[in-house]
UniProtKB/Swiss-Prot annotation:
The lineage of its organism: Bacteria, Pseudomonadati, Pseudomonadota, Alphaproteobacteria, Rhodobacterales. One of its GO terms (cellular component) is cytoplasm. Its EC number is 2.3.1.181. Catalyzes the transfer of endogenously produced octanoic acid from octanoyl-acyl-carrier-protein onto the lipoyl domains of lipoate-dependent enzymes. Lipoyl-ACP can also act as a substrate although octanoyl-ACP is likely to be the physiological substrate. This is Octanoyltransferase.
Length: 155
């Protein structure tokens, strides 16, 4: 099903936490890249509460996990798996859509697509990384880290 947001193919289903972020960027600065970077930082901060190091990569939107436990890519670089996808749309500088974080989805559902159009990398989840984290645990971590990345606006 096609939707009007950034990004290419992805999968949404049970076991993912979808977060639709609606913020007025007229009041926070009309900078789409800074907004996406803040979304990524928000997820990275939340993952850090579970001692999981999420990372961003130039040219690839989303949050990535280095996988030294997997075979290297053909070019010798370390394999990385995506744990969170980001797809946003702006209308009159108000954001729509947002992020999806893999908590415990059936990762087999990704087999038929190239997630977000990025070749050579896989997909992971909190549970796949050996963390017994539930939706409620992630929700608390996201709540705690939100204001660090999206500070309240004055008056």
């Amino acid at each position: 099903h096609a939707v009007g947001r950034g990004g290419q193919y992805t999968y949404h289903g049970p076991g993912q936490r979808l977060v639709y972020v609606m913020l007025d960027l007229n009041r926070r600065g009309r900078d789409v890249r800074a907004f996406v970077k803040a979304l990524e930082s928000w997820v990275i901060d939340a993952l850090a509460e579970f001692n999981l190091k999420g990372e961003i990569r130039d040219g690839r939107v989303g949050v990535w996990i280095a996988r030294p436990d997997k075979a290297s890519l053909p070019d010798g670089s370390m394999r990385e798996d995506k744990i969170a996808a980001i797809g946003v749309k702006l209308r009159r500088w108000v954001s729509f859509h947002g992020i999806s974080i893999n908590v415990e989805p059936d990762l087999g559902h990704y087999a038929g697509i190239v997630p977000c159009g990025i070749q050579g990398h896989g997909v992971t989840s909190l549970v796949d990384m050996g963390l017994p984290v539930g939706m409620g645990d992630l929700d608390l971590a996201l709540r705690r880290s939100f204001a660090r990345n999206f500070p309240p606006l004055g008056g």
